[in-house]
Regions:
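Positively charged
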Residues: 1-165
Length: 165
């Protein structure tokens, strides 16, 4: 049986969500990268999430986990290219449970990131995985779901959550 490493999510008002996170330093790590990956993955799964960034659990690192098979943990990611085509789709965030809003994002991205084993990869992602990764990037850049949608869509999402309880 695997040990539960999951953590509590920070509140939407926590200032860490507004900070540009620091690079994860593999040469002098503040915590083991494999352990951090497991913490993020377990917390994401426990909360039925699709993406979870370190600041959402109170850690100031440029790291996030994305639901995939297997789960991807991206350290110090950089989006190196995006398609010019952008579409609106509904998104949610573990930071704002129950709020669903429309967000316009590129459909295809190329991203360079480091894995927990310190290997660097550059990969292309499309569709929903691309969108989850862009959400993770926002989170480590101090940008929340509320920041990437229009005020109209935000208000509609809040109203719908209240209506649905």
């Amino acid at each position: 049986m695997e040990t539960d490493l999951s953590r509590d999510l920070v509140k939407p008002t926590d200032s860490i969500l507004r900070n540009d996170c620091e690079r994860f330093d593999f040469k002098d790590p503040q915590m083991n990268p494999d352990e951090l990956s497991h913490i993020l993955a377990q917390t994401m799964m426990k909360n039925n999430g699709l993406c979870l960034a370190a600041p959402q659990i109170g850690l100031p690192y440029r790291v996030f986990a994305v639901l995939s098979n297997p789960i991807l943990c991206m350290f110090n990611p950089i989006i190196v290219d995006t398609t010019s085509e952008e579409i609106y789709l509904e998104e949610m965030s573990l930071t704002y449970p129950g709020i669903v809003v429309k967000v316009k994002r590129p459909t295809i991205i190329r991203i360079r990131f480091t894995q927990p084993d310190e290997k660097t990869r550059t990969e292309k992602y499309i569709g929903m995985t691309s969108r989850y990764i862009q959400q993770g990037m926002d989170s480590i850049d101090g940008i929340t779901l509320k920041d990437v949608t229009t005020s109209y869509h935000w208000e509609q999402g809040v109203k719908k959550r209240k209506k649905n309880g």
